[in-house]
Amino acid sequence: MAVRTRRQRQQEAEKKGKRWPYAAAAAVAAVVAAHYYNATVIRSDDLGTGTMFDRIAPHYDKANDVMSLGLHHGWREALIAGLDISSNDNALDLATGTADVAILQGKRGATVLGVDPSKNMLDIGRGKVTEAGLDDVVKLELGDATSLQLNSSIYDKITISFGIRNIPDIDSALREMRRVARPGALLGVLEFALPERGFLAPVARAFVSVVVPVLGAVLSGARFDEYAHLARSIAEFPSPDRFRDRIAAAGFEAREPQLFACGAVVLYVATAV
C-alpha cells in the first residue's frame, strides 16, 4: 500500500474543503425537494381548482398578507366601496375562499352567499364568519361558478376577487353571473394584471414570475408548481381592456377599470343590462 505524504494529505483536505459548499447546497436542495415531492401529488388538471386550494388553505391568509404587504385588505375595501353595498342588498361572492369579501359585505348589512370549490377554504371562512358575529347574514357553500345551483335574477351585488383567472371557462362564469343578477345589479371583479407600461412594470412582472411562486410555496407549505400556476394564470389573463370587453359580452355595461399597485391589481365594476 502506497504511503501518502504529508503534502498529499494536505492537498486532499484542501480539495474537500473547497467541495463542502457544493455538498451543503446539494443537501439543502434535497431537503427542499423532499418537502415538495413527498407531499400529496397534484395532477396538472388540479392546478387552480378546489383540490389545490384545499392543500394551501391553512396558510392562505398568511401568505396573502406577506406577499401583498397587507395591501390586499385595502383592495377588497375598494371593491366593496365601488359597489356601494347596503343593508338591502342580496349579495353573491364567488371564489369566496376564506370569506374576506363576504364578511365585508355582511358587516355593511347585506345578506351574503359565498360560493367556492374548496371545502377547506370554506371551513376556515366559516370560522371567520362566526368570529365576526355574522352567521345570520353570511352563508358559505361549495359550488362551481360556471354552473351555479341558483335561481335567475335574484342578486343585487355579485363579487369575485382574485379568483376569476382560475376558472377554466371565464366566459361561462361571466354568463352565469349575469343570469343570477337582477337587471341593474352591480358586478365587481378584483383581479391581478401584469403592468405593461411605467418604469415599475419590469419589477412587477419579475415579482409575479419569480417571487410569488417561491415565497407563496414557502409560506403556505404548498408545492412550487401550485404557486407557479398562480403566477402563470396572472401572466395569461387578458389585459384590462380585453377583459372589460368580455364582461360586456356577457351582458354587463362595464365602467373604466380602476388600477391599484401601479396597475398590478385591477378593479372592474359593471352593471347588468
Language-model features and meaning:
Residues 13-51:
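N-terminal auxiliary segments of SAM/dcSAM-dependent transferases
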Residues 59, 69-89:
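Conserved alpha-helix/loop element of class I SAM-dependent methyltransferases that forms part
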Residues 90-147:
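Class I SAM-dependent methyltransferase SAM/SAH-binding core
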Residues 115, 190-250, 256:
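C-terminal alpha-helical "lid/dimerization" subdomain adjacent to the S-adenosyl-L-methionine
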Residues 146-158:
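A short acidic, Gly/Pro-enriched loop at the edge of an enzyme's catalytic core
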Residues 156-170, 193:
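A short SAM/SAH-binding and catalytic strip from SAM-dependent methyltransferases
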Residues 171-186:
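A short glycine-rich, Lys/Arg-flanked "PGG" loop and its adjoining helix->strand segment in the class I
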Residues 250-273:
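Core SAM-dependent methyltransferase catalytic element
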